[in-house]
Amino acid sequence: MAITAAMVKDLRETTGAGMMDAKKALTETNGDMEAAIDWLRTKGLAKAAKKSGRVAAEGLVGVAVRAGRGVAVELNSETDFVAKNADFQQLVRDITNVALDAATDVEVLKATHLNGRPVDDVLTDAIARIGENMTLRRLHALEGDTIVSYVHNAAAEGMGKIGVLVALKGDAAKAQEIGKQIAMHIAATNPASLSEADLDPALVEREKSVLSEQARESGKPEAVIEKMIEGRMKKFFEEVTLLGQKFVINPDVTVAQAAQEAGVEVTGYARVVVGEGIEKKEEDFAAEVAKTRAGA
């Protein structure tokens, strides 16, 4: 596979590796970006990299909670201007509240009635009225004894660019207090899972493979290498799992310890970021102006 300058640039931006190292990594892995990241890491030429998932789509995440159930709904728009529109925000609010009743996924939500009509039809009308394409993209529902919500970069009450839900059990008042702090922590740190047991096995295996290769590059005895791998995997679990992470409000304890000290237990969470994983075309403003003038 031909290695292009754009591929090298993307890999450098993702890993911080030098140009020649990035090119060699892509050559060694036949242009496979994820494999190239791992190759650089095994050579100690890149930091552990999370999947890039550039956020490009606009819109809002709406969150709502009622009687032990919470939902986070993502409604995308083409521009941030429309996301600030009062009609659009009311649509997010209405759809989020409808989702609270029983919706379990986006397709169910689209068929659910809002003011006597399917949500999908209401959305079609809004597209025609507001004049911009919109997509009802994701719905996360969470249930538990106590559900706490948090919105980061709020555009209006109950909606913003990042929506978080946390499920807890224990004393309701204490759960509300610590739950809000944990929700803010989740918004900031983006954990991969609640606990080690919930992690994607493929992610764990990939990390272990990279760390094993790194350890063996040291040339130390096998017994020492095994200890190195064990220690590094322990650190990995602490960094990517919610319960294992250092609590941002008080880094002297983990999230699990903070919850335990408050007399509650975290049983689940959801984190939704507007446009997460969607890549939209970057517009060259100067070229766009030139094109417009040429056509005038």
Curated annotation (Swiss-Prot):
Keyword set, alphabetical order: Cytoplasm, Elongation factor, Protein biosynthesis
SUPFAM superfamilies: Elongation factor Ts (EF-Ts), dimerisation domain (SSF54713), UBA-like (SSF46934)
UniProt keyword Amino-acid biosynthesis present: no
Major subcellular site: cytoplasm
Molecular function terms, GO-annotated: translation elongation factor activity
Superkingdom classification of source: Bacteria
Positions of region (Involved in Mg(2+) ion dislocation from EF-Tu): 79-82
Protein localization: Cytoplasm
Full protein name: Elongation factor Ts
InterPro entries, per database record: EF-Ts_dimer_sf (IPR036402), Transl_elong_EFTs/EF1B (IPR001816), Transl_elong_EFTs/EF1B_dimer (IPR014039), Transl_elong_Ts_CS (IPR018101), UBA-like_sf (IPR009060)
Family recorded in the similarity comment: Belongs to the EF-Ts family.
GO cellular component: cytoplasm
NCBIfam families, per the entry: tsf (TIGR00116)
Function: Associates with the EF-Tu.GDP complex and induces the exchange of GDP to GTP. It remains bound to the aminoacyl-tRNA.EF-Tu.GTP complex up to the GTP hydrolysis stage on the ribosome.
Gene designation per UniProt: tsf
Gene3D superfamilies: 1.10.286.20, DNA helicase RuvA subunit, C-terminal domain, Elongation factor Ts, dimerisation domain
